[in-house]
Amino acid sequence: NFLFNNNKLEYLINLKRNKNKKINIFIVPFWGEIYTNSFFENLLPSLKSKNNLEWIKKNYDVEIHLYVDSNFYNFQKKYKITNKFFKLNNFKINTLDNFIDKKRDELSSKILNSYIDHAKKCIKKNAMSINLCADFILPENYLKNIALITHGKPFCYTHTQLRVNKSILKTIKKYKKNDKIEINNKNLINLALKYPF
């Protein structure tokens, strides 16, 4: 109780338990062909799978923050993802060039300032943050499970991913239909163990 004097911990518990249904998903800043292709070919289709994006949209006040370079829009056209799709799914697209700090190294300032921007948005809205990378592949129910496990609890969580060899992507394609990657936890873990980094 020494960390939260004057019943502040109790206030946080009640706030989370009773009111807070805000989630900001932070896609770690990405640019370049490899990571941008990976976002469109893997992360985005896995976000569309069962009990991920659709479920969390129905049950929470969610925003998905992307921090990308200006070439992102060329890839968006290539993959035929409309602005309407991004808007309907509450994607907020931020261009990395807006986060350059002339007093720092360009690359590190883009990354650091994107994190700071996201943190400020979470604090302002009292929103939980879920961090994902452009090269992640999420199993079905991933976002639902994270939201249900953490909802109503006044503490942080962490999640880890297995690093895998890129040859796993050939097998992942078997799970991709209608621009969705539908794979359950067990199958994804088994595949990751077959293709260690």
Show where each model-derived region lies.
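Structural motif
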Residues: I23-I25, M128
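Short loop->beta transition adjacent to catalytic acidic/histidine clusters or analogous donor-positioning motifs
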Residues: N24, K50-H65
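A conserved hydrophobic helix/loop-capping motif in glycosyltransferases and polysaccharide synthases
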Residues: F26-I34
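Short beta-strand-to-loop acidic/aromatic patch adjacent to the donor-nucleotide binding site
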Residues: K124-P139
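Long, contiguous juxta-domain segments that are non-catalytic but functionally important
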Residues: N1-K22, F39
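Short, well-formed alpha-helical segments that are part of the catalytic scaffolds
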Residues: I34-W55
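Active-site-proximal specificity loops/subdomain of glycosyltransferases
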Residues: Y67-M128
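Conserved catalytic core of nucleotide-sugar-dependent glycosyltransferases
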Residues: K102-I111, Y115, A119-K120, F136-F197
